[in-house]
Amino acid sequence: MKYVVMVSHGEFAPGLHSAVRMMTGNREDVLSTSLKEDMSADQFAENFAELVKDFTADDQVILLADILSGSPFTNALNVLSDKGLISNTLIIAGMNMPLAITAVLMKDNFDDLAALKEVLLSEG
């Protein structure tokens, strides 16, 4: 399966996920989590690991993050790397609504994540 996973500080990723859901419907291949004010980076990493626990080596991940090199971004990458999924992951920081909707609606039209990346970067 090809997943879109959104991560952020605060409620940005869950809020964006909610808005995307209004446009694309509720989908099991779109997930989100966030680093909340009262949460440590380690707690975020644990939550992210739980979110992606069923991902397999055959899965592909489109990781959308709010900020390049922020705690959600780096911890998500560490978890995906530990699971052996980093080579199957397209990573984009600076997520926004057009980018997220395009990722969800177009991801299954591309076998190659590099080709999808070109489309997504034109939206973001």
Task: Name each region found by the language model.
Residues 1-124:
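N-terminal loops that bind phosphate or other acidic moieties
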